[in-house]
Curated annotation (Swiss-Prot):
Residues 119-136, 161-173 have a biased composition (Basic and acidic residues). It is found in: Nucleus. Keywords: Nucleus. Residues 1-196 are annotated as: Disordered. Residues 175-196 have a biased composition (Gly residues). Pfam families: PPI_Ypi1. Residues 1-40, 90-99 have a biased composition (Low complexity). It comes from Chaetomium globosum (strain ATCC 6205 / CBS 148.51 / DSM 1962 / NBRC 6347 / NRRL 1970) (Soil fungus). GO terms for molecular function: protein phosphatase 1 binding; protein serine/threonine phosphatase inhibitor activity. Belongs to the YPI1 family. The keyword Protein biosynthesis does not apply. This is Type 1 phosphatases regulator YPI1.
C-alpha cells in the first residue's frame, strides 16, 4: 500500500490549481562602494603608405611648352631656357638651341617644309632640328624620300568654311530658285514673290 499512497498525493497535487508563490524582496546595504572599471579605448592612427610607383621630378627651369599645366616627357623636345655665357652647363642638358626660341622655331619649320631632312643609310635623320637628339621621334612631313615639297596653303577648319549653295539663276530666270528649271512655282505656297 505504500506504493499507492505516493500516487494519490501526486494526483492531488495535479488536481489543485497552482498558486503563485509569495515573493519577498530583501535589500542589504552595502558598505563597500562598487566601482565598475572599464578598459580605456586606445585609438592608434597610422600614416598613409608611401607610393611605391615611379614618379617624374622636373627641374625647376623646365618650361611647360604647351601651356596645359603638364610637361612633356620627351627630353629632346622640352625647351630649356638659354644659358648665359658665364653659366655652366653639363653635357646631358646641352643643346644647340641656345640662341633664341623664335629663331630656332623658324629654322625647324622651314627645314620641315623644304624637305631638308634626308634619311641616311643607318636610319638616323636630323629633321632640321634646332636641338640635338637621336632623331627617333616623329615629325610632321617627315615622309622623307628627299624630294622638295611645296608648302601647302593651310586649309580652313570647320568653323571657317562657308557652306556651298547652288548658284542662283543657273537657268537664267534670276529668281533664286537654284536653277532647278521648274520655274517660279517651287517652294512653300503663300511665300515669296508669287503672293505679291
Amino acid at each position: 500500500m505504500s506504493s499507492a499512497a505516493p500516487r494519490s498525493q501526486q494526483r492531488q497535487q495535479q488536481r489543485q490549481p497552482s498558486r503563485p508563490a509569495p515573493s519577498q524582496t530583501e535589500t542589504t546595504p552595502s558598505t563597500t562602494p562598487q566601482t565598475h572599471t572599464q578598459p580605456q579605448a586606445i585609438l592608434r592612427l597610422r600614416g598613409a603608405h608611401a607610393p611605391t610607383g615611379r614618379s617624374v621630378q622636373w627641374r625647376s627651369d623646365v618650361v611647360d611648352n604647351e601651356g596645359l599645366g603638364r610637361k612633356k616627357s620627351k627630353v629632346c623636345c622640352i625647351y630649356h631656357r638659354p644659358r648665359g655665357v658665364d653659366e655652366s652647363s653639363d653635357s646631358s642638358s646641352s643643346s644647340s638651341s641656345d640662341s633664341s626660341d623664335s629663331d630656332s622655331d623658324a629654322d625647324s619649320d622651314s627645314g620641315r617644309a623644304s624637305g631638308s631632312g634626308k634619311k641616311t643609310g643607318d636610319g638616323n635623320h636630323k629633321q632640321g632640328h634646332a636641338h640635338d637628339c637621336d632623331g627617333h621621334h616623329s615629325h610632321r612631313g617627315s615622309r622623307g624620300q628627299g624630294k622638295a615639297r611645296r608648302k601647302r596653303r593651310p586649309s580652313p577648319n570647320a568653323y571657317e568654311k562657308m557652306p556651298r549653295y547652288d548658284k542662283p539663276g543657273k537657268d537664267g530666270d534670276g529668281d533664286g530658285s537654284g536653277g532647278s528649271g521648274e520655274g517660279k512655282g517651287k517652294g512653300v505656297p503663300g511665300q515669296g514673290p508669287q503672293g505679291a
